[in-house]
Regions:
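Conserved E/DxxT/N motif and adjacent residues on the DHp alpha2 helix
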Residues: 36, 43, 155
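Cytosolic ends of transmembrane helices, especially the final helix of ABC transmembrane type-1 domains
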Residues: 9-37
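Alpha-helical structural signal
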Residues: 7, 31-34, 103, 175-176
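Signal-transduction coiled-coil helices of two-component systems
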Residues: 24, 41-44
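ABC-type nucleotide-binding domain
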Residues: 46-47, 51-211
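Membrane-water interface of transmembrane alpha-helices in multipass transporters/channels
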Residues: 1-5
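Extended non-transmembrane interhelical loops and adjacent amphipathic helices
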Residues: 28-40, 59-63, 167
Length: 211
C-alpha cells in the first residue's frame, strides 16, 4: 500500500517534467527557426553608389522586364508599361499571372532578371532602399490591425505623427467621416485585428496608416 501511495505521489511530478521537456523541445525548434531567419542574408541590397530617392511624383516605367523565381518558368517576359503620376491602375488577371510580382518588383523586394524599373526616371537599383520604402507602401487585402485605438493604428508607421497628421491621412483614405461617427472617434478601441470594424473600414484604416 505504501508503495502504491508513493508511486501515486511521484506520477504528478514525473508527468509535469515530461510535459516541460516536450515544451522545451518545441521551444528549441522554434528558436532554431528564428535564428535561421535572422542569419538569412537579404537578396536585395543597396548598390555601393546608391543615392537617396528625392520626393517622388509617381511616374512608373517598366522597360523590357523579365522575372523568374529560383530558375523556374518565367513569371514575366519583356513586360513594358508606364503609369503617369496620379493615374489609377488596376492589374487584372488569373492567379499566377504576375500581379503580385509586379507590385513586389515595384517595391524592390526583388530585382528583375532583365530590363529596368524606373520611378520618376530613377532606376530602383540605383536608389537606397530606405529612401524608397519611406515613400511607397503596400496595403494587403488581409489588413493587419492591432487591438488599440484607431489613432494608434494609423500612427503606427510613424510614431512622431501629430493628431493633425493622423486626421489628414484618414481624410486622404476616406476614413475620417466614419471615424467621426464613432462614440470615441479616433480614441475608439477597434479590437484585435479590427474585429469591431467592417472589412471596408479596416481597409481604410490600413490605407490611412500607409499614407
Amino acid at each position: 500500500l505504501a508503495f502504491v501511495l508513493f508511486a501515486g505521489i511521484l506520477i504528478g511530478p514525473f508527468g509535469s517534467a515530461a510535459r516541460l521537456f516536450s515544451q522545451l523541445k518545441e521551444a528549441q525548434g522554434a528558436m532554431q527557426r528564428v535564428f535561421e531567419l535572422l542569419d538569412t542574408q537579404p537578396e536585395v541590397t543597396d548598390h555601393p553608389q546608391a543615392h537617396t530617392l528625392p520626393t517622388i511624383q509617381g511616374h512608373v516605367k517598366f522597360s523590357g522586364v523579365d522575372f523568374t523565381y529560383d530558375s523556374r518558368q518565367p513569371v514575366l517576359t519583356d513586360l513594358s508599361f508606364e503609369i503617369q503620376p496620379g493615374e489609377l491602375v488596376a492589374l487584372v488577371g488569373p492567379t499566377g499571372s504576375g500581379k503580385s510580382t509586379i507590385a513586389n518588383l515595384l517595391h524592390r523586394f526583388y530585382d528583375p532578371t532583365a530590363g529596368s524599373i524606373k520611378l520618376d526616371g530613377h532606376d530602383l537599383r540605383e536608389v537606397t532602399l530606405e529612401s524608397l520604402y519611406r515613400q511607397i507602401a503596400i496595403v494587403p487585402q488581409e489588413t493587419i490591425l492591432f487591438g488599440e485605438t484607431i489613432f494608434e493604428n494609423i500612427r503606427y508607421g510613424r510614431e512622431s505623427a501629430s493628431e493633425e497628421d493622423v486626421i489628414k491621412a484618414s481624410q486622404v483614405a476616406n476614413a475620417h467621416d466614419f471615424i467621426t461617427t464613432l462614440p470615441d472617434r479616433y480614441q475608439t478601441i477597434i479590437g484585435e485585428k479590427g474585429i469591431n470594424l467592417s472589412g471596408g473600414q479596416r481597409q481604410r484604416i490600413a490605407i490611412a496608416r500607409a499614407v
